[in-house]
């Protein structure tokens, strides 16, 4: 098992990034809660990782800290929740907000996440509540996000939302509703998700 990787960010386009470690490029899938903390390309970063091996693919998931990774591991143990949905949860509302929803049994907010129906939301609460009762990260991502090196942050943001399970029309409508110029892709995604999932 690969526990963590320290290397240079070559490319980043949510939910994927390319990390070069000792001359080897690792393609890593990460939640948006991790992307909010990533530096610019060509900068060094340490990512905690989780490797999932299947017959058709070996997929490496990366996380800003061990708290995120532990929550991801708890999520994929829930019946009906796979890695893709676990990433959508971490991307949609973030670790702390998810824990708050679980501990307060806020089913209505959980079902706003793409792919999470009422039954899945109820299972998330039932199967993770005990383990999350002492959860604290004390790690709030920057509300401004990080500047994307890509010259098309709007399109990158729409693509990232689609990768999370939103329909193209929903993704475009959410991004278009943000009337703020010169924002990075990460910030656009964060604001769009805040509106769609949290309703604020």
UniProtKB/Swiss-Prot annotation:
Region Domain I, residue ranges: 1-64
One GO term (biological process): DNA repair
Region ranges (Domain II): 65-143
Protein name: Holliday junction branch migration complex subunit RuvA
Description of its domains: Has three domains with a flexible linker between the domains II and III and assumes an 'L' shape. Domain III is highly mobile and contacts RuvB.
A family per Pfam: RuvA_N
Disordered: annotated span: 133-152
Cell location: Cytoplasm
Record keyword DNA damage present: yes
Database matches in CDD domains: UBA_RuvA_C
Described purpose of this protein according to its UniProt entry: The RuvA-RuvB-RuvC complex processes Holliday junction (HJ) DNA during genetic recombination and DNA repair, while the RuvA-RuvB complex plays an important role in the rescue of blocked DNA replication forks via replication fork reversal (RFR). RuvA specifically binds to HJ cruciform DNA, conferring on it an open structure. The RuvB hexamer acts as an ATP-dependent pump, pulling dsDNA into and through the RuvAB complex. HJ branch migration allows RuvC to scan DNA until it finds its consensus sequence, where it cleaves and resolves the cruciform DNA.
Subunit and partners: Homotetramer. Forms an RuvA(8)-RuvB(12)-Holliday junction (HJ) complex. HJ DNA is sandwiched between 2 RuvA tetramers; dsDNA enters through RuvA and exits via RuvB. An RuvB hexamer assembles on each DNA strand where it exits the tetramer. Each RuvB hexamer is contacted by two RuvA subunits (via domain III) on 2 adjacent RuvB subunits; this complex drives branch migration. In the full resolvosome a probable DNA-RuvA(4)-RuvB(12)-RuvC(2) complex forms which resolves the HJ.
Similarity remark: Belongs to the RuvA family.
Native source species: Coxiella burnetii (strain Dugway 5J108-111)
Region (Flexible linker), start-end ranges: 144-148
Keywords tagged on the record: Cytoplasm, DNA damage, DNA recombination, DNA repair, DNA-binding
SUPFAM superfamilies: DNA helicase RuvA subunit, C-terminal domain (SSF46929), Nucleic acid-binding proteins (SSF50249), RuvA domain 2-like (SSF47781)
Residue span of region Domain III: 149-200
Coiled coil feature spans: none
NCBIfam families: ruvA (TIGR00084)
GO cellular component: cytoplasm; Holliday junction helicase complex; Holliday junction resolvase complex
GO MF annotation list: ATP binding; four-way junction DNA binding; four-way junction helicase activity
Gene name in the database record: ruvA
């Amino acid at each position: 098992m690969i526990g963590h990787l320290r290397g240079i960010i070559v490319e980043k386009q949510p939910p994927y990034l390319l990390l070069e470690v000792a001359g080897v490029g690792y393609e890593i899938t990460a939640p948006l809660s991790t992307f909010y903390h990533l530096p610019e390309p060509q900068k060094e970063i340490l990512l905690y990782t989780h490797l999932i091996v299947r017959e058709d693919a070996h997929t490496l998931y990366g996380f800003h800290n061990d708290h995120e990774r532990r929550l991801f591991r708890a999520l994929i143990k829930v019946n009906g929740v796979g890695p893709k949905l676990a990433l959508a949860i971490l991307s949609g509302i973030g670790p702390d907000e998810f824990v708050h929803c679980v501990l307060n049994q806020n089913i209505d907010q959980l079902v706003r996440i793409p792919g999470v129906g009422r039954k899945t939301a109820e299972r998330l609460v039932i199967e993770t509540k005990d383990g999350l009762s002492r959860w604290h990260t004390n790690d709030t991502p920057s509300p401004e996000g990080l500047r994307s090196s890509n010259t098309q942050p709007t399109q990158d943001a729409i693509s990232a939302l689609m990768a999370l399970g939103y329909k193209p029309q929903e993704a475009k409508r959410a991004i278009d509703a943000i009337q703020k110029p010169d924002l990075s892709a990460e910030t656009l995604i964060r604001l769009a998700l805040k509106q769609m999932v949290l309703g604020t």
